[in-house]
Amino acid sequence: MLGQIVGGLIGGHHDSKKVKGTVVMMKKNALDFTDLAGSLTDKIFEALGQKVSFQLISSVQSDPANGLQGKHSNPAYLENFLFTLTPLAAGETAFGVTFDWNEEFGVPGAFIIKNTHINEFFLKSLTLEDVPNHGKVHFVCNSWVYPSFRYKSDRIFFANQPYLPSETPELLRKYRENELLTLRGDGTGKREAWDRIYDYDVYNDLGNPDQGKENVRTTLGGSADYPYPRRGRTGRPPTRTDPKSESRIPLILSLDIYVPRDERFGHLKMSDFLTYALKSIVQFILPELHALFDGTPNEFDSFEDVLRLYEGGIRLPQGPLFKALTDAIPLEMIRELLRTDGEGILRFPTPLVIKDSKTAWRTDEEFAREMLAGVNPIIISRLQEFPPKSKLDPEAYGNQNSTITAEHIEDKLDGLTVDEAMNNNKLFILNHHDVLIPYLRRINTTTTKTYASRTLLFLQDNGSLKPLAIELSLPHPDGDQFGVTSKVYTPSDQGVESSIWQLAKAYVAVNDSGVHQLISHWLNTHAVIEPFVIATNRQLSVLHPIHKLLYPHFRDTMNINAMARQILINAGGVLESTVFPSKFAMEMSAVVYKDWVFPDQALPADLVKRGVAVEDSSSPHGVRLLIEDYPYAVDGLEIWSAIKSWVTDYCSFYYGSDEEILKDNELQAWWKELREVGHGDKKNEPWWPEMETPQELIDSCTTIIWIASALHAAVNFGQYPYAGYLPNRPTVSRRFMPEPGTPEYEELKKNPDKAFLKTITAQLQTLLGVSLIEILSRHTTDEIYLGQRESPEWTKDKEPLAAFDKFGKKLTDIEKQIIQRNGDNILINRSGPVNAPYTLLFPTSEGGLTGKGIPNSVSI
């Protein structure tokens, strides 16, 4: 009798069975190489009895000694760890593990792992091959496990069966709650590499006041003047000279900036990323060395001078034999250096915009087309009042309304009056005026000399846009309250007026380039999505269905944003060095964030808000485009609808009523924290969804996924194809429009190309900017695209798996439709004069510089 009681208490081992499992893990590595010294040390620890143990946790059998939580199995250990050869190249290794199991224990719902080695390892998965009466049980882990002494609580992983909080097996609830508490931390202390804590902070680490006044930057976030989304907290100490500014780590340690360990790039991505950087540095340095022996070392003397950046280089052999050899190389960095896609090394790849023609980029048709199918197709709007009016406060900025008149444009409206053209939805505007004017006076005190622009366009019968007029404005010399001084330019193809028109378009491109980088790209994708990453990990358990839905769309975002704060958007960083707002760049983006509205990030809402579409319930996506051949919008609506259909199927499986949404305490805490902390500077905005209905959840999750995947792809991966040739999208202008009677005007008449190149981005800035966007435009080899998952076992629920499979098939159909549209000669905006088919919303891609592919997340 006593034996039965004891046997029951210890798990009934008299009828125990063996359950085999497979552990997939990757040892600590340095880029492509396994840390052999660390691996040897771990083997020594293993030989001394310091092992890696696993204990299953029952979801049905309680343990009185453990507060009636799920009972733990006896520890099981990795098998043959000592005798498994350590590969030189970093990669996954599978180990067996055998557990004692009995009928009373039932199905395991989680397991605890204890690493008593000295080094961390990456735990990919544990699969129990055949739990009696339950079959296979999968635990998808994808987490770095440090030595146990680094943690204050046990490392726990849950099986792939999702549960809403109220449906969680009683014996697993405490484990679920405690894991979330661990991930939240207590908001104190400096974060270390092994910490798994997600927390918030303001952008108070962009400047470095300890290095002088010129390196001071405004804190973004936490104020009405400069609101901003929150970033991940690092807990670094304050600077010596300003206790409100966070100190910075040395540039050489940039890769070590804190993000939770599981948010860091994987070894394949890090290898690709550093290889791309190495190649770009070489491509950057060689022209600079040549320039030392040039009479004008910081100037391109001609367009031929610019083109030499791309032509030549060392061409590696191509063909199946060489490809087979490189594919067999285990080291990703070397494989990437020896790419067989035809790219030369030691020269920049030829950007798509000049591949077919070296001059088509200069046409008015291409200038306008890129507003619909270029790298920044999300700004153009329909003109709804003429002349265009400013929304800036007239008390502070005077009269900012446009000086464009009907006389400037009516001869180009195919016989229509301005009112008739507007009423027929024929007039459109690219408007950068109000965003730039408040900062333009200060910007022009730097080496930048530029304008705020308005560009009017006419929708022609063939579906293309025709530029009508460009207005360039400067703050009034007597003060902001006196408004602006403006000049209007109209198209010309004759003499010096033609050269002036080309310069006017260049100033517009400079405006658009800066707005693209700071707002369309950085603010509207990178910055706004980070609070969602943090809140999801803090408030939604990995068991939560919505965590499982959103998790793939947050991959690598915190890491790339942290690196951006360290080397790109910081004081004196690459962004300040290459875009026209210079040191005012990030502050400008905070002012623009004042107008950010979460529901308006949904593609249909955005199109309607910009007036380029109208609501129409009879249209396939609920809106009708007023520019029918609008490649970004056409492809985007297909992608948007596919995402929404997938999210609807998924969420409807778990939530059938408003009550189920309201009683989900994790979901409500998640949304509350997003509003009040993550985007806390906008917490009182009336437009926030209340998260009270399944439809609000569906709409919100669709928008989050859209921002992280398709919107980012549309504004990121076209950077090199369109802006890799800087004359097409200059980032800086260095002098104003030449005035008659000046030496600059005479130069413009005699040598318009040289005058153009002396006006836009200088040679050094060009090389730096092109090097950066080449890196940012590449896909890494481990990229996971929309409609794909890292593991096929991401959930146990069959209906969501079937819905996800349907989503993938829909995306494949969309790819076929994009190919078909790109081959339709009637749709002239799909390729344009430069013959560059629109593929930025083509869902999949191979690695490298492809100009297509929608990664799941903001990952670069």
From Swiss-Prot:
Signal peptide: none annotated. Gene3D superfamilies: 3.10.450.60, Lipoxygenase-1, Domain 2, Lipoxygenase-1, Domain 3, Lipoxygenase-1, Domain 5, PLAT/LH2 domain. Keywords: Cytoplasm, Dioxygenase, Fatty acid biosynthesis, Fatty acid metabolism, Iron, Lipid biosynthesis, Lipid metabolism, Metal-binding, Oxidoreductase, Oxylipin biosynthesis. Residues 162-860 form the Lipoxygenase domain. Pathway: Lipid metabolism; oxylipin biosynthesis. Monomer. This is Probable linoleate 9S-lipoxygenase 4. It comes from Solanum tuberosum (Potato).
